[in-house]
Design a protein with these regions (language model features):
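Generic preference for hydrophobic
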Residues: 27, 58-60, 146
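NAD(P)+-binding Rossmann beta1-loop-alpha1 motif at the extreme N-terminus of oxidoreductases
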Residues: 1-51
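Short, well-ordered alpha-helices that flank and scaffold nucleotide-derived cofactor binding pockets
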Residues: 17-21, 85-89, 112, 278, ...
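Rossmann-like NAD(P)(H) cofactor-binding subdomain of soluble oxidoreductases
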Residues: 50-135
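NAD(P)-dependent Rossmann-like dehydrogenase/reductase catalytic/cofactor-binding core
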Residues: 170, 221-307
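Internal alpha-helical scaffold of NAD(P)-dependent oxidoreductase catalytic cores
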Residues: 89-90, 112-118, 131-240
Length: 307
C-alpha cells in the first residue's frame, strides 16, 4: 500500500517512520531545509533506550504527483484545504484521505477533494516530540482508531480496505481498530480538547490549575455541558456528569501539563480553535442550540491570536 504523509512534523514523522516498515511511504512538506535533512539522514524514531532509522523519500509540496492509496494528514487543521489543493496530483479516484488531527469537522473540508466513501477520520493516543528535523521521540503509546465519515444514507468506505489499513497500522506497531461509530470517538476526544485544553490556552495556565481553581473549573464545567449537548445531535450521547468527572480526573493526573493550544497562544501562532470549539459551535448552530460559553471562548482565542 502506498501511503503519503502530508505534514512531516513530530506526529507525521512518527507515523510515517513506523509505517515505512510495512508500506511504501512518502513524506510531503513545505520546509526545504527540514526535507533536505530527512532525505540525507532518514527518519529516526526513539523510544526509551532504543531507536530505529528508516530512509523515506520526502518531497516539497506540489512536486510529487504519484497517486497515493492513502493520504495521511498531519498538518494543522486549518491548512487542510490548502495542502490538498497544492497536492491534488496525489489524489486519484480510489485514494482514501485520513486525518488523525485534533478537533472535528475536518471531513467537511476533505469532502471537497474526495467522496464520502473515501474520507476517513480518527483519533490517536500516540505522542511524539521532535529533537531535530529528522529525529523524533515516541513519548506516548495508545490506540489509534479510525472509520468512515459518511453521513447516514451515504456510501461508506470499503470494509476490506479499512481492514487492510488497520492491519498495516498494527504491523507497524500502532494498536489500531476500526470504529463503526467514529464520530463518538472524535467527540469523546473533543470533550477534553474543547474544554480544559482550550481553557488552559486562554488562561495561560497548566492543566492542574483548571481542576483546582473554582472559577476556572466552573467555566470548564459549562464548556463540557455544551459539548455534550452538541454531540447528542450528532449521535454521540454522553452523560454530562460522567464527563465532568472524567475531565477533572484527567487534569489531576497531569497537573503540570501544558496543551498545544497553550503553546500556540504563548508563541503567537494561529491555533486550531476553529476545529475544536468551532466544531462545537457549528454543530450546535445546525441543531438550533445555544452554546454561549463555547462561542465566548472561541472569540477570546481569536482575540489572543491577534496580539
Amino acid at each position: 500500500m502506498k501511503i503519503t504523509v502530508i505534514g512531516p512534523g513530530a506526529m507525521g514523522l512518527l507515523f510515517g517512520g513506523k509505517l515505512a516498515a510495512c508500506a511504501d511511504v512518502t513524506l510531503i512538506g513545505s520546509n526545504a531545509v527540514n526535507l533536505k535533512e530527512i532525505n540525507t539522514n532518514g527518519v529516526t524514531i526513539k523510544r526509551g533506550d532504543s531507536s530505529v532509522t528508516r530512509k523515506i523519500p520526502a518531497y516539497m509540496a506540489g512536486t510529487c504527483n504519484e497517486t497515493a492509496d492513502v493520504i495521511l494528514l498531519f498538518t494543522k487543521a486549518y491548512q487542510i484545504a490548502d495542502v490538498l489543493t497544492e497536492n491534488k496530483g496525489l489524489i486519484g479516484p480510489d485514494t482514501m484521505l485520513l486525518t488523525l488531527q485534533n478537533g472535528a469537522g475536518h471531513d467537511r473540508v476533505m469532502r471537497e477533494f474526495a467522496d464520502s466513501a473515501h474520507v476517513l477520520i480518527g483519533t490517536t493516543k500516540q505522542g511524539s516530540y521532535r529533537e531535530s528535523a529528522s529525529v523524533i521521540v515516541n513519548s506516548g503509546l495508545g490506540e489509534t482508531v479510525f472509520g468512515g465519515a459518511a453521513a447516514k444514507g451515504e456510501p461508506g468506505p470499503d470494509k476490506a480496505r479499512l481492514e487492510e489499513l488497520r492491519e498495516i497500522f498494527e504491523n507497524a506497531g500502532f494498536p489500531c481498530s476500526v470504529s463503526e461509530n467514529i464520530r463518538f470517538d472524535v467527540w469523546n476526544k473533543l470533550m477534553i480538547n474543547a474544554s480544559s485544553s482550550v481553557l488552559s490556552g486562554v488562561l495561560q495556565v497548566p492543566q492542574g490549575y483548571i481542576a483546582e481553581d473554582s472559577y476556572a473549573w466552573s467555566i470548564c464545567e459549562d464548556l463540557i455541558r455544551e459539548i455534550c449537548a452538541a454531540a447528542a445531535g450528532e449521535g454521540a450521547i454522553f452523560a454530562p456528569e460522567e464527563q465532568i468527572l472524567r475531565v477533572r480526573e484527567h487534569l489531576r493526573n497531569a497537573p503540570d501539563g501544558y496543551t498545544s493550544i497553550y503553546a500556540d497562544i504563548k508563541n503567537g501562532r494561529k491555533t486550531e480553535a476553529d476545529f475544536i470549539c468551532g466544531a462545537v459551535v457549528r454543530a450546535a448552530k445546525e441543531q438550533g442550540l445555544s452554546v454561549p460559553v463555547q462561542e465566548t471562548i472561541l472569540r477570546l482565542v481569536h482575540a489572543m491570536e491577534g496580539r
